Amino acid sequence: EKGFGFLTQNNGGADVFVHFRAIASEGFKTLTEGQKVSFDVEQGQK
């Protein structure tokens, strides 16, 4: 809805900010609450 959100890590680490541009998928880029994903954490500009 907003184009951004946060991912919760399984290892208990801090939540990770994610922007829709970082989603690697075709078509409409969206995630749903509770959806399992894999990701690499990168430091970006704020």
UniProtKB/Swiss-Prot annotation:
Domain CSD, chain residue ranges per copy: 1-46
Alphabetical keyword list: Activator, Cytoplasm, DNA-binding, Stress response, Transcription, Transcription regulation
Intracellular or extracellular location(s): Cytoplasm
Matching Gene3D superfamilies: Nucleic acid-binding proteins (2.40.50.140)
InterPro entries the UniProt entry points to: Cold_shock_CspA, CSD, CSD_CS, CSP_DNA-bd, NA-bd_OB-fold
Any one annotated GO CC term: cytosol
SMART domains found in the cross-reference section: CSP
Protein name (record): Major cold shock protein
